[in-house]
A protein has these predicted regions:
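Periplasmic polypeptide-binding modules associated with outer-membrane biogenesis and secretion
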Residues: 37-240, 252, 268-277, 415, ...
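Transmembrane beta-barrel outer-membrane domains
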Residues: 200, 215, 242-246, 271-277, ...
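Repeated loop/turn-to-beta-strand initiation elements of outer-membrane beta-barrel proteins
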Residues: 205, 230-232, 259-265, 288-293, ...
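Structural signature of outer-membrane beta-barrel domains
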Residues: 214, 239-241, 272-274, 298-302, ...
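Transmembrane beta-strand segments that form the barrel wall of outer-membrane beta-barrel proteins
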Residues: 230-240, 251-255, 261-272, 280, ...
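Feature captures outer-membrane beta-barrel proteins of Gram-negative bacteria and organelles
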Residues: 249-258, 276-297, 318-328, 364-372, ...
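Transmembrane beta-strand segments of outer-membrane beta-barrel domains in Gram-negative
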Residues: 292-446, 551
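C-terminal transmembrane beta-barrel domains of outer membrane proteins
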Residues: 403-573
């Protein structure tokens, strides 16, 4: 690989030295073309956007399909006409009798009574309380069953840490928020605290209830264990740009919980034939409520090959990021988190040894994201993220006079949405639908534009095909689990993709096909085993490409099937 320029642009407050005619020619070369025109050379913003898409992890398989846990009935039968409840104070008894109605007036086995006890516990849980139910020794031949309900009341909180790296006192304050001695366990608060503690990198927390010192109370004892100090992954794929190298290798390393307070230091490296990317990040809990702060920095350097090699086109992009995140809802069935992030980008491009363009962008992004697990009809899972972005783009004053991209100079705003739903159709079949899109209120910098092509979009087209300010992609996949032997899983799927793009929100000049769509269909295979994931997919274009030239794609490749592969190995238990 050729050495990449570390500082291709060094603005010194001067006007650029090229004559006016040369500037006009360069401006025409880098302007976004109308559909059917040759593609311009990619710039730092496009390369940055492509790198961020390549770094995004593929969506995981959905949670396992729901199965019934009730064992088959066995042993003697008896008929129950009435349930006598003892120890019930937090709920009206009528609520529990209504929940037990399916078990009255019919022959039951002992296993059926155990299912009835679970229904009582579920009723408490649905109202936000923790309880246990059991059957005291009794004679049930008369048709009356006595159920003893032990309503959980908090006694005290203990920690078993045994000289661990994790700070037990900090974790105890996180789990114990909202718990008061002698009062009933508020199940949502208890569940939230335990889940937040287990969200901390490099920390495992298990809560056990034990009989308390005071009658009717239960003590919560936390078993705190350390996870591995180091984690990470390596990956190889072909989702790079044709001009910087399709093959890319990615390495990630994390240092988990080095301080004992649930922090994480991360580093990411990506290498392509003509691309180098490096990033670092740090996250830290701010108190025990779940609030987290994050800092990040990335640096990217590129050089264009293929037909742009003679231009000696190269550039760099640097990104600073700071954010605050807070879990609005944390539970085993649904989660919602909010994040506010500030981002600053500096993007530089050069050609033929001359500084070409310098752009600076700053924005604030408010993100809401979450997921939910659904019951019924085999079960399902939904995950979503919504971003609302407001920012400002600045170009060097000398460039504004000639650059058609100057239309992106100034303030911008946009909204992004990603929605994914998985639904089990049977023990081995599930359907996945994914909608991804954005809407801008004006023209955007290339680093912020939406793209249809690539393995995360319309999979029958190459990376960076059909970029624009606003757009959307819908992916539909039908999956079949072919085998789950040992600890591995083989998953085959058919897919169909369709996307629409608006190249410029506020077009200038002649753009006959500012709006158009692309479609593709294909098949794929995924293999998971012990942290190793292999993805292979083939996408075939369906219909024509209004944005292409003479039947080819915008990057000059012929229209035909696209083969995508990605191999990833995680180094964490």
């Amino acid at each position: 690989m050729r050495a990449l320029a570390r500082h291709p642009i060094r603005p010194q407050g001067r006007r650029f030295a090229l004559p006016r005619a040369a500037w006009l020619a360069l401006a025409a070369a880098v302007a976004l073309p109308a559909a059917g025109a040759p593609a311009p050379p990619p710039d730092a913003g496009q390369v940055q956007r492509q790198a961020e898409r390549a770094l995004a992890a593929p969506p995981p398989p959905p949670p396992a399909a729901a199965t019934s846990a009730d064992p088959a009935g066995a042993g003697p039968q008896f008929e129950v006409h009435h349930f006598r409840l003892e120890g019930v104070t937090l709920l009206p008894e009528d609520t529990l009798h209504e929940a037990l109605a399916p078990w009255r007036g019919r022959p039951l086995h002992f296993a059926d009574l155990q299912a009835a006890l679970r229904r009582i516990v579920a009723a408490y849980r649905a109202h936000g309380w923790f309880a246990r139910a059991d059957l005291p020794e009794q004679d049930i031949t008369e048709g009356t069953v006595t159920v003893r309900v032990l309503e959980g009341r908090f006694g005290r909180l203990g920690v078993l840490e045994d000289d661990r790296r994790a700070r037990g006192d900090f974790i105890a304050r996180m789990v114990g928020r909202g718990l008061r001695a002698g009062e009933p366990y508020p199940l949502p608060r208890l569940e939230r605290g335990l889940l937040l503690a287990n969200d901390l990198p490099g920390v495992y927390v298990d809560g056990v209830l034990r009989p308390g010192e005071q009658p009717g109370t239960s003590d919560l004892v936390l078993q705190v264990d350390d996870g591995p100090l180091f984690g990470g992954s390596i990956a190889v794929g072909n989702d790079g740009s044709r001009y910087t190298g399709r093959a890319q290798a990615i390495a990630r390393l994390t240092l988990d919980n080095p301080s004992g307070y649930g922090d994480q230091l991360g580093a990411t490296l990506m290498r392509g034939e003509e691309l180098e990317y490096a990033g670092t990040s740090y996250t830290l809990p701010l108190g025990t409520s779940g609030l987290r702060g994050s800092l990040g920095y990335t640096s990217l350097h590129y050089r264009l090959g293929k037909e742009f090699e003679e231009l000696d086109a190269r550039g760099a992009s640097r990104l600073h990021r700071a954010g605050l995140g807070y879990p609005l809802l944390r539970s085993g069935s649904a989660n919602v988190e909010m994040e506010l992030a500030w981002t600053r980008r500096r993007q530089e491009d050069a050609s033929l040894g001359e500084d070409l363009r310098l752009r600076r962008l700053q924005d604030l992004t408010l993100s809401l994201f979450g997921d939910a697990v659904h019951g019924g009809h085999g079960g399902g899972h939904t995950a979503w993220i919504a971003d609302f972005v407001r920012g400002r783009a600045r170009l060097e004053e000398a460039w504004l006079e000639f650059d058609p991209a100057a239309a992106v100079h100034g303030r911008y705003s946009m909204a992004r949405l990603e929605l994914r739903h998985d639904r089990w159709l049977g023990p081995d079949w599930y359907l996945r639908a994914r909608l991804n899109g954005q809407r801008a209120n004006g023209n955007l910098d290339s680093s912020l534009q939406f793209v249809l092509g690539g393995p995360a979009g319309v999979r029958g087209y190459p990376v960076n095909e059909a970029a624009g300010d606003s757009g959307a992609v819908l992916q539909l996949e039908l999956h079949r689990l072919l085998g789950t032997g040992g600890d591995g899983e083989l998953d085959a799927y058919l897919f169909a993709d369709h996307g629409i793009i608006r190249q410029r929100q506020d077009p200038w000049g002649y753009m006959p096909d500012n709006h158009y769509g692309l479609s593709a269909a294909g098949l794929g295979l995924r293999w998971n085993r012990r942290g190793f994931t292999a993805n292979l997919a083939v996408g075939v274009p369906v219909g024509n490409n209004p944005g292409g030239l003479d039947g080819d794609n915008q990057d000059g490749t012929g229209r035909g099937p696209q083969l995508w592969f990605n191999l990833r190995q995680r180094f964490r238990p």
